[in-house]
Each structure stands twice: as structure tokens, then as C-alpha cells.
Amino acid sequence: MDSIVSAASVIAAGLAVGLAAIGPGIGQGSAAANAVEGIARQPEVEGKIRGTLLLSLAFMESLTIYGLVVALSLLFANPYVG
């Protein structure tokens, strides 16, 4: 039974990292594209747009890091393995 739980934990860890990276990756690409478009339209507000972009990218990246933490806890501190 432990081998099944271990195998399921490895699969779940891979899915956790993979799925946690898809959403923020798409969001970061969209945010960067819109920021470049906004800077191209109004170059005088470049500093304000860049600051907001960097803050929002950090928040989006934190979601991926949370997925990594879940994956590492499943691999190394698995509560389901007896």
C-alpha cells in the first residue's frame, strides 16, 4: 500500500508544479503584453506602469511557489505515508 501512496504522491507533486505554473505563466505574459502596449501609448507614465507590473508579477509568481511548496511537502514530508 505504501508503494501506491508513494507513486500517487510523485504524480500529484508533478501535477501540482505543472498546473501551478500554467495560470501564472499565462497571466504574466498577458500582463507584460498589456504593460508594453500601455507604455507604447503613453510613454510618460512608464515608471508607474513598470512599478505596477513588477508588483503584479511578484504576486503571480507567488502562486507558482506555493505549488512548489505543496509538491515538496508531498515528496519529502508526506502525511499519507505511514
Curated annotation (Swiss-Prot):
It is a multi-pass membrane protein. One of its GO terms (molecular function) is proton-transporting ATP synthase activity, rotational mechanism. The record marks 61 as: Reversibly protonated during proton transport. The keyword Ion transport applies. InterPro entries: ATP_synth_csu_bac/chlpt, ATP_synth_F0_csu, ATP_synth_F0_csu_DDCD_BS, ATP_synth_F0_csu_sf, ATPase_proteolipid_c-like_dom, F/V-ATP_Csub_sf. GO terms for cellular component: chloroplast thylakoid membrane; proton-transporting ATP synthase complex; proton-transporting two-sector ATPase complex, proton-transporting domain. The chain crosses the membrane at residues 7-27, 57-77. It is found in: Plastid, Chloroplast thylakoid membrane. Its main location: plastid. Pfam families: ATP-synt_C. Keywords: ATP synthesis, CF(0), Chloroplast, Hydrogen ion transport, Ion transport, Lipid-binding, Membrane, Plastid, Thylakoid, Transmembrane, Transmembrane helix, Transport. PANTHER family: ATP SYNTHASE LIPID-BINDING PROTEIN, MITOCHONDRIAL (PTHR10031), ATPASE PROTEIN 9 (PTHR10031:SF0). In plastids the F-type ATPase is also known as CF(1)CF(0). F(1)F(0) ATP synthase produces ATP from ADP in the presence of a proton or sodium gradient. F-type ATPases consist of two structural domains, F(1) containing the extramembraneous catalytic core and F(0) containing the membrane proton channel, linked together by a central stalk and a peripheral stalk. During catalysis, ATP synthesis in the catalytic domain of F(1) is coupled via a rotary mechanism of the central stalk subunits to proton translocation. Belongs to the ATPase C chain family. This is ATP synthase subunit c, chloroplastic. It comes from Porphyra purpurea. The gene is atpH.
